Design a protein with these regions (language model features):
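Accessory carbohydrate-recognition regions in carbohydrate-active enzymes
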Residues: 27-376, 380-424, 430-487, 495-521, ...
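ATP-dependent phospho-/nucleotidyl transfer catalytic cores
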Residues: 492
């Protein structure tokens, strides 16, 4: 009997040990904890690590001092290799290739205030160490040893709260230095309200991409409220300090508030912004952070981030791969940004205050030339409601500004890239299920701005539209980027056609599908490349495949693959599959990071080459794409230098996400994916229809890049293309991977992704 009891005991114990984690065992971290906001803050990427809610208007992030008009640290405000912080900004733009935002800078300090911060980014800088710095979604903390103060921040959509733990008995202060926006300011005001322990103000700034702050300016307003009374206060006007002065205005202003000795008595600061008024900023703050509960706010935003990040989860892979993946998803939940206040008001492209429709949000900050290729698909997949509002927001911008914006920041069109990328962005989101917007009005606006030259708020629009319609291409002697602009416009036309088709406008669909084939007009049979062409019909000469004349951020060989809607025609024009395969072999024999517009190789660091890794699927050699995509994935990692180029508001990160799940949206405006095989054992996606799509992979590790078989809901899949409508209702997509190519799978006569004529 005793032996029987002992036997039963050991059986029960062994079962418990098999199902309960050992205290020392390593457990997979949550999707929230896997995010590392420092990824992409190094040499390339241009990301920032600060505290922000999903798509939040406000982002509290550190800014590094820089002494040039533009350097690598000035773009997002932060560069991981820098050792000093000169303040915390309230607005930032992630991944962009030019310096932007970093508005309404402030810094907690101690000691004397004997230097003016006006126009001096070094005046109150402090050293910092990454050993005493933490960043998680919605949270940022860092110690500033020069002032013996520990800072931490967390954020809601329009507001944020910070806590400053002073460890010195010296007088504690908070310095406001708005002239340290990325491009300075054109005007501004600061007001100190001692009775309510509040500082308010506004600045006018702008000048994206090396421009003056007076060029295409926007206004941003703020309110900052403290939980400690002011022992002193004052302002600066230029280099002159004015103690006990409460108000200051101009383009050379700063202010301070003091708290006396606050050693071991933390000071809290609540802040909010608005693009409408100080009063609206105050309403935003009162609505979102009514008390001083830092931990409560942090818990709320953590829950919100967890909700978004749980919409696409992965299992398997290495810890570094999971961190890279979830951070890439995180990067695609930062922009575009909520632009309306809690009362629904927002500043329109006509510089008038408008009211967003109940239940909707107005969004701003669209890096469309970058994001239409990848982020548009991912955001519509993860956040269809928000994506619908983004489409409606762009329509509002067009109605108020006269035409769709192409590359906008806040309520200003900067137009820094070629093409008219609003259209493929909208068409991609629609194709992926973001459909709660005014389709007919959007279609009508697209037709309007693509047949008559109209500007958005006085800028950009469909550049060279008359020439494009007359010649069927953009002459390089009329615009220096004529070749790449023509290719982009073909993608734009194809995207407009898809919206026209969805809206039931068949004649317009046919018209734009015809225009979408204009790439043929710049194809040079001699070089078998898309070559810049002049008004007289002659091709640009001299010409080489790596010359950049006629192309925006690239060259002829890099743009050769830029007809995603009709790759069959490109293959035919160039002489057939064998020639294109040999060209692609040479092109992808090296992968370039960083800046490489004059190189003959696959430039992973910039958007026009994103889709070229998947072209083998059109050539009947899908195993070559499968291996190449794994090489692409290996160019990313979970370090600050982990991105191979500018993240461009999430575009680069979205390339990683789709490559890692083995499904890439290769055709702008079409809902579907070309297939390359997942990196992870299991991927789970919550679709916009409330269903769950599960992707599984046997033998998924990096050493097994090749697809052996694919089944969806237990039925064989033999094509390298899967339409989204087959997946969006959920199901199980099973892959079997291997370390040797299967030269039969995906090679059938109908196995390639579609081309549209």
């Amino acid at each position: 009997m005793l032996r029987m009891l002992r036997t039963k005991f050991y059986i029960i114990l062994s079962v418990l040990m098999s199902v309960l984690p050992l205290s020392g065992a390593s457990q997979p971290v949550s999707s929230y904890d896997a995010v590392n906001p420092f990824i992409g803050t190094g040499n390339e990427g241009n990301c920032y690590p600060g505290a922000q809610a999903p798509f939040g208007m406000i982002s509290i992030s550190p800014n590094n001092p820089f002494d040039k008009k533009e350097d690598v640290a000035s773009r997002p405000g932060y560069k991981y290799s820098r050792t000093e912080i000169n303040g915390f900004g309230m607005t930032h733009f992630s991944g962009v290739g030019c310096h932007a935002m970093q508005d309404l800078q402030f810094l907690p300090v101690t000691g004397s205030l004997d230097r003016t911060p006006v126009g001096d980014r070094f005046a109150y800088r402090s050293k910092f160490s990454h050993e005493h710095e933490t960043a998680k979604p919605g949270y940022y903390a860092v110690s500033l040893p020069d002032y013996q103060v520990d800072t931490k921040f967390t954020a809601m959509p329009h507001s944020a709260i910070g806590e400053f733990a002073f460890k010195s008995a010296d007088d504690a202060h908070c310095v406001f230095m708005p002239t340290n926006s990325a491009n300075g300011i054109g005007a501004g005001e600061l007001h100190i309200e001692t009775s309510s322990m509040t500082v308010t103000g506004w600045v006018s700034t702008g000048g994206f991409c090396w421009r003056d702050p007076h060029d295409r300016p926007y206004r941003v307003y703020f309110v900052a409220k403290f939980n400690a009374r002011f022992s002193d206060y004052g302002t600066w006007k230029g280099r002159e300090k004015f103690p006990r002065q409460s108000n200051v205005a101009g383009d050379d202003i700063a202010a301070f508030v003091s708290f006396g000795n606050r050693k071991d008595r933390p000071v809290k600061m609540k802040m909010a912004i608005s693009y409408v008024s100080i009063d609206n900023a105050r309403q935003n703050l009162n609505a979102e952070i009514s008390c001083w509960d830092f931990d409560g706010v942090h818990s709320t935003v953590q829950d919100e981030w967890t909700d978004y990040l749980s919409r696409m989860t992965v299992e398997g892979g290495t810890e570094a791969e999971r961190k890279t993946f979830y951070t890439a998803v995180y990067h695609n939940l930062l922009h575009p940004n909520i632009y309306n206040d809690v009362n629904g008001a927002y500043m329109g492209f006509d510089d008038k205050v408008h009211q967003v429709e109940p239940g909707r949000k107005q969004y701003a900050n669209f890096s469309l030339w970058d994001t239409y290729r990848t982020s548009s698909f991912l955001q519509a997949l993860l956040a269809p409601k928000e994506s619908s509002d983004m489409i409606q927001s762009l329509l509002h911008d067009a109605e108020q500004g006269g035409a769709y914006p192409n590359w906008s920041m806040n309520n200003v069109e900067y137009g820094v890239m070629n093409g008219y990328s609003t259209f493929p962005f909208i068409a991609a989101m629609y194709a992926m299920g973001a459909r709660d917007f005014d389709l007919q009005a959007s279609k009508d606006m697209m037709k309007k701005v693509s047949t008559s030259y109209l500007k958005c708020k006085g800028y950009q629009g469909w550049v060279c539209l008359d020439d494009y319609m007359r010649y069927g291409y953009v002459p390089v002697d009329k615009h220096g980027h004529g070749a790449s602009m023509t290719l982009e416009y073909c993608i734009d036309d194809f995207s407009i056609a898809q919206i026209c088709k969805a809206a039931g406008d068949s004649s317009a669909y046919s018209y734009y599908m015809d225009r979408a084939q204009n790439f043929e007009n710049i194809f040079d049979k001699e070089t078998r490349l898309f070559r810049p062409r002049k008004q007289d019909g002659s091709f640009l000469s001299p010409f080489t495949e790596t010359g950049t004349d006629g192309y925006n951020e690239g060259n002829a060989i890099q743009y050769f693959w830029s007809v995603p809607h009709n790759m069959d025609a490109v293959i035919s024009l160039a002489g057939g599959r064998k020639f294109v395969e040999d060209r692609l072999d040479a092109f992808t024999s090296k992968i370039n990071r960083g800046w490489a517009p004059d190189q003959p190789y696959y430039w992973l660091g910039n958007e026009p080459c994103f889709g070229s890794a998947f072209v083998y699927n059109y050539l009947g050699k899908p195993w070559k794409s499968q291996l190449l995509v794994r090489k692409v994935l290996s160019s990313f990692n979970d370090t600050p230098d982990g991105l191979p180029g500018d993240d461009d508001a999430g575009a680069m990160s979205a390339l990683y996400v789709f490559s890692a799940i083995g499904l890439y949206p290769c055709i702008p405006g079409i809902g579907g994916f070309t297939v390359t095989g997942p990196l992870f054992d299991r991927v789970q996606i919550k679709t916009g229809k409330g269903k769950v799509l599960v992707i599984t992979a046997q033998n998924a590790p990096t050493v097994n890049p090749y697809i052996q078989s694919v089944r969806f809901n237990k039925k064989d899949v033999t094509s390298t293309w899967i339409p989204w409508h087959q997946l969006e209702n959920g199901g199980v997509l099973d892959f079997v991977m291997g370390n040797m190519p299967d030269r039969h799978w995906g090679t059938g006569s109908n196995a390639a992704p579609p081309s549209f004529y």
